[in-house]
Amino acid sequence: MAKNFLIELGTEELPPTALRSLAEAFASNFEAELKAADLAHQGVKWYATPRRLALKVAELAESQADKVVEKRGPAVSAAFDADGNPTKAAQGWARGNGITVEQAERLKTDKGEWLLHKEEVKGKPVQELVVDFAAKALAGLPIPKAMRWGNSDIQFIRPVKTLTILLGDELIEGSILGVSSARTLRGHRFMGESEFTIDSADQYPAILEERGKVMADYDARKAIILADSEKAAAAVGGKADLEDDLVEEVTSLVEWPVVLTAKFEEEFLKVPSEALVYTMKGDQKYFPVYDENKKLLPNFIFVSNIESKEPRHVIEGNEKVVRPRLADAEFFFNTDRKRPLIDRLPELEQAIFQKQLGTIKDKTDRITELAGYIAEQIGADVEKSQRAGLLAKCDLMTSMVFEFTDTQGVMGMHYATHDGEDEQVALALYEQYMPRFAGDDLPSTDISASVAMADKLDTLVGIFGIGQAPKGSDPFALRRAALGVLRIIVEKEYNLDLVDLVAKAQSLFGDKLSNANVATDVIDFMLGRFRAWYQDEGFSVDIIQAVLARRPTKPADFDKRVKAVSHFRELDAAESLAAANKRVGNILAKFDGELAQEIDLALLQEDAEKALAEKVEILAEALEPVFAAGNYQEALSRLAELREPVDAFFDNVMVMADDEALKTNRLTLLNKLRNLFLDIADISLLQK
């Protein structure tokens, strides 16, 4: 008979940003143990609050099924000697299985006859298994840094206080992480019963809500927070900023969510909203509220962990907490604006970018020149791009950014606007950091794009130039920087070459760089980011590898090639031509001599090679302007016409002829054929 199974681990406060991943991993690991043990069940559900991780398994079988295990022994031919007596090999095998050779069965196969022992294995009761399964599941959690507590050597992400393991109404005895299983559950710190006992797994999680004032279901808590926050925002005429990461964190901080609305003085709205939002979301875990025009309202929503009889006191307490932070932002904003942003440029000499690469001022000088160079290439205003580059890092020296670091860039934009800088220059100070994460918006103007690329390329070349390419960790966010440059170039269709950009960036460092191969290393690294990007976009690895094999260094051109090869792969001729290209590559790799540039038509003898040569020559001429225009999809569609003449060639022509002139001419034909494809990609790398 199947029963519901429960395990709950009570702990001290777990890290909120890791709670979901810990709970999901616990469930996944435990379910894997059940599967490996062949224990039937109707699903595993995880529960998580700041002070507990729990699993409930529906309809868990009470024991493993009995099964017959077949143990094959030596072949009959090796099990008996010429007189029919068991050999030592047979006797040893039988002894190891607790039988005699005479008791062994025979197994006949196409490859011969073997000794066989069928052993009945009784399934173990689940009570003997689950404690070990849970211990293994917990040991496999993604814990970046474990801790010890008390005098024990036991380590876990946080000290463990309680353990409950139930199968139906039966308490499973056992110990995990130094705590023995018991029926005791802990309720909310400030509401309900602080401790109580549970009689059956069937009571979970309802008993926690009823007696402990704890909502163990993570997704249910999150749903309440979302729904009630939307209602609360609507009640003040706005819409809440319910960013998922913050909602997840808040969900992980409370066991009994109560959504409340508070307000702050309207005078604070004179401060750029980004600074106010930074302190509300980052410091206090509040949800800002915006009106229909996306302007910040003087309200915020927060989630309390208690159901107070006097919610007004809770609201006032939170208003009292946030008010000084908003006042600080107001003070910094007013103070910073007393000096023009450009006046802070010399102060950048005091800030180190990287010990070997100099100060932020040094970086600013490089960004300024590189932004101007890029602007010239893409037709942007060079003077404005350089002005934006010069001002780009000045806000790092302001009080606001020093206190609220995530406001860098956006405060530069506000201060530049206040100083009367050009609108696009000011905007570039904000957009220089775009894209900040996968899927983020790109810089909206060419000036912004010039500065954004200059900043990222300077960091890439500089850090690679001193031999600090990212391995496991990536402290300078080089992967993000590389992908950012690629996205800007591809999605804005700029005709830029990484070779030129990296060379220009490298030249601006003077003699600071010690890595002689910095240009190659940076370009290879950036091309490697293409693979990750296009895989995320759904392109198969072999398509990306086919293009990477040609190492095209113009990102916009790279994009066209990938999409063209992806389209080509869907054509009927693709598989045959990919195989033919692979065959041609193998043939040419074995040839040590020199090939002519052109096919000698006079040496063509077979009809099949004449037909192929004619088709290759026609396509080579016809596709020249197509290649030049970068219309690779059209080119590959035309090259698909080679399928039949290529197949006929290999069916009817001996490439490696005895006559040296014939052989070399045929190899020249194949080389010219292959080069037509290699002008786009190495399609021989395409898989079936």
UniProtKB/Swiss-Prot annotation:
Entry GO MF terms: arginine-tRNA ligase activity; ATP binding; glycine-tRNA ligase activity
Cross-referenced InterPro entries: DALR_anticod-bd, Gly-tRNA-synth_bsu, Gly-tRNA-synth_heterodimer
Gene Ontology BP annotations: arginyl-tRNA aminoacylation; glycyl-tRNA aminoacylation
Compartments in which it is found: Cytoplasm
Keywords: Aminoacyl-tRNA synthetase, ATP-binding, Cytoplasm, Ligase, Nucleotide-binding, Protein biosynthesis
Catalytic activity, EC: 6.1.1.14
Catalytic reaction equation(s): tRNA(Gly) + glycine + ATP = glycyl-tRNA(Gly) + AMP + diphosphate
Gene Ontology CC terms: cytosol
Any Pfam family matching the protein: DALR_1
SUPFAM superfamilies documented for this protein: HD-domain/PDEase-like
NCBIfam families per the UniProt record, alphabetical: glyS (TIGR00211)
Subunit (UniProt): Tetramer of two alpha and two beta subunits.
Assigned protein family: Belongs to the class-II aminoacyl-tRNA synthetase family.
Name of the featured protein: Glycine--tRNA ligase beta subunit
